[in-house]
Amino acid sequence: MTIPQETLDQLTHVPMPKHVATRQPNEMLQLGADIIPVYRSEALVIGSGAAGLRAAVELRRRHIDVLVATQTLFWGTSACSGSDKQTLHTAATSKQGDNFIKLAQALGAGGAMDADTAYVEAVGSVEAFAGLKYIGLPLPEDRYGAILRYQTDHDEAGRATSCGPRTSRLMVKVLAEEAIRLGVAFVDHSTVIRLLVAGEGRERKIAGAIAINSGDRGENNPTGLAIYLCPSLVLAAGGPGELFRDSVYPKRCFGSLGLGLEAGITAVNLTEHQFGIGTRRDEFPWNLSGTYVQCMPYIYSVDDKGNEHNFLAEYYRTTQELAANIFRKGYQWPIHATRMLDFGSSLVDLAIFSESQSGRTILMDFNRNPQPVAGDESFSLERLEPDVASYLSNNDALLPLPIDRLRRMNPLAIELYKYHGQDISQSPLAFNVNHQHMNGGLAVDTWGQTSLSGCYAIGEAAGTHGVTRPGGAALNAGQVFGLRCAKQIANQTASPPLAVAQLHKQIAQCMADITQGLSNENGLNLQQIKADIQQRMSDKAGFICYADEVSDALQAAQQLNQVIQQQGIAIPYVNKVAVSFQWRHMALASEALLTALDFYISQGGGSRGARAICSAQGEAVPESRQGPLADYRFITEKPEHRQQQLTVTYQQGKFAVTVSSLRQLDDLNAIFFEKNWPDFLTGALYR
């Protein structure tokens, strides 16, 4: 059946609402010659992506005065990234239904994930999912009303569903429309640069935030400084997309990790990420998963003289094996060290990495089938491995060319690139291995609250995931914790308003940092800091990571932060104030991650999930058809590390690492209606 062009356009060209409710300052604060606006609310949400908007919508539904501060309205990772069929992973609602315990086990199967968090995400997926459908997310159904499902990464049960390449953008759109309908107020072009904290020791709690608001710039406030005061704050500005040079994140995605670390909030699982193939960031960054590779395009490289190289044929033993592993990247998209062994699917990524290290450009051609391995037969639909043949047959996609197979299985995947200026039906697509997602982040409890009382983290800002996660589990987690943090905030006892005078010292210090940066000719250059961090992270802490190089990388990151503390950052213009703080946060996040990684390796930590920890003392060696790949010998994972998490806290200018046991799930058999109903009626369960 041919899908009408109008339908394809609706699912790929997704415009965002433009008119939102705004908020005027509640009061003005005079500090020296500056007059600074102060915004008060019962809850502040930082970020306007899918997770932040869900929190804002749920808070407003519960009659909480919520304000959303956002760097760019309805823009960021949720709105601007995706894949072939961007996945939402929830409890299945087709055929035999689902089992929450089994879903929770699947979410945490890779280890290092709290069991109670996994169960919360499993159970909460039903309400989160239904809420999205209710406000208009076009999730596909069969004629009986069951949601269409498929299998994705780390997903044996087939719990994935999708609206196409732009699932998360469509989520942002429908949540934005609901927020507007509910009258949620927004402050656009607002970059939060520091959290405000009240109290000491165990009494520390969130008090608000300092931001740079372009709309508040004026003669008496040249930098646009603004103060937000609130008893509850939700960090929902995403992950640290600028941390790596080789990244598939949209540009200017700094996230909330460094901001939280600076405030002393504990982080967890910073060693856990997702890396995978995607188009390059300087063009149109996008994950090349699912049908982009299940159609089995020809993957090759071009050297600086224009010569073409069928490099994958140097790694796999037969043409059939080569094609099968390109196909399997569709649902084994994230790199996993163990899949580099035994001619598995992550050997594709290793080959791409090695080829790109030699300076060659990697391309994907949808008009040519995989070229043969030397001495073997050509690619043929008559010689496919069983899982490949079954999938293509079930989807009526046993067609001559990759572009035909892709058009049959997912025409939206072609439309998306065409919309962004590249017709993959006509020309090859350049791509590489990129950093795609941080599974770790700020540590939270089962309500999304961090170690700083009143401060929540949701979406990629939160470190709720373990070593691995099913594709689409991150979108689900953001929705579940957007709901849960709203429920807890709405059931808190109202705090008395905080007088802004109590925070003068913190505000004055921030202003002093800005003043010093604007007149600091000897401060570090922003471009230097960016290049230093991104090069080090991609080269020393990427998916190929050499154990003996991490300690030196950590020392370099520590030295960078020491120089920033001593010399400061040169801020060339007033409009660079916000980004100077963001790079300060990236420097902290980089040191935190390398601190955790160095500690993990020193404890004998091995290769799992995101990284191959390469070492001459490693036990495992990937092989190609030409023999062992000795340069990529790696240390294997210690099973006991799956039962632990590494937490990192910034105190007195240094990062400290702690080994923590996983939180377990209480005995669910002890929960009964009559016994537990009062906890719900009185709100006790939220405390």
Q: Where does each model-flagged region fall?
A:
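Extreme N-terminal leader/targeting segments of oxidoreductases
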Residues: 1-43, 61, 163, 204
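Conserved redox-cofactor binding core of oxidoreductases
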Residues: 20, 128-224, 236, 279-291, ...
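Core beta-strand elements of the Rossmann-like FAD/NAD(P) dinucleotide-binding domain
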Residues: 38-41, 220-232, 451
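N-terminal Rossmann-like FAD-binding beta1-loop-alpha1 element of flavoenzymes
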Residues: 41-68
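Glycine-rich FAD pyrophosphate-binding loop
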Residues: 61-82
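Glycine-rich loop(s) and the adjacent beta-strand/alpha-helix scaffold that form part
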Residues: 229-287, 472-488
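An anion/pyrophosphate-binding glycine-rich loop and adjacent beta-alpha core
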Residues: 266-412, 488
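Long, amphipathic alpha-helical stalk/connector segments used for oligomerization, subunit docking
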Residues: 494-577
